[in-house]
Swiss-Prot record:
Belongs to the ribonuclease III family. HAMAP family: RNase_III. Residues 180-193 have a biased composition (Basic and acidic residues). Digests double-stranded RNA. Involved in the processing of primary rRNA transcript to yield the immediate precursors to the large and small rRNAs (23S and 16S). Processes some mRNAs, and tRNAs when they are encoded in the rRNA operon. Processes pre-crRNA and tracrRNA of type II CRISPR loci if present in the organism. The keyword Transcription regulation does not apply. Its EC number is 3.1.26.3. GO terms for molecular function: double-stranded RNA binding; metal ion binding; ribonuclease III activity; rRNA binding. It is found in: Cytoplasm. Residues 11-136 form the RNase III domain. It comes from Sinorhizobium medicae (strain WSM419) (Ensifer medicae). InterPro entries: dsRBD_dom, RNase_III, RNase_III_dom, RNase_III_sf. This is Ribonuclease 3. Keywords: Cytoplasm, Endonuclease, Hydrolase, Magnesium, Metal-binding, mRNA processing, Nuclease, RNA-binding, rRNA processing, rRNA-binding, tRNA processing.
Amino acid sequence: MKGRSLNAEDRARLEAAIGYQFAEKERLDRALTHSSARSGRAINYQRLEFLGDRILGLCVAELLFQTFSDANEGELSVRLNQLVSAESCAKVADELSLHEFIRTGSDVKKITGKHMMNVRADVVESLIAAIYLDGGLEAARRFVLEHWTHRAASADGARRDAKTELQEWAHARFGVAPKYRTEDRSGPDHDPRFTVTVEVDGIDPETGVDRSKRGAEQVAAMKLLEREGVWQKRSAGN
């Protein structure tokens, strides 16, 4: 969807998909508006995304705390990072077909595809914030539980911290320590994207992207461990 707002039919279809009816329809429009859709009032989802990220983290942390009563802080953190990642949020967006409703400028060709994963993830967080502002925390929590409870149950929390695992594996296999290098930092200050490369002498490097430097390091380490067969690669449904 390009610059136009939702019509009544589209709004009803989307509200049915997400299981929530907005009292203030403008909140839903804002949550779906990418910064490239330059309207006269320059309304977009960036501020909502900032809030939605925190609400999602709270609701998922609460879910994990209640579900995995025997898990320690480290395991809970691993599970949390998996569940609130851009990849997980983008999968929720795809399940809801949000790409059909996102408002963009004419210079944005398409929202689908891996290279636009962050946009779809951002819209999910913005949608959570819009629901929170319109209906309160309980409404936002219901949405999160609907789409994250089964993910929490299937998340591979048994995995250790990826950087720790890679450190020990690289030392045992090659007698060296991994080296991490920050390749790029992009995005606005409130929502940065870090690109980090991890190198282990003797094998090809891997690159990770995340909203924090540490997160990007973890993603890069995880990808290398999966590529080398140290960790089993997670299925697309998890």
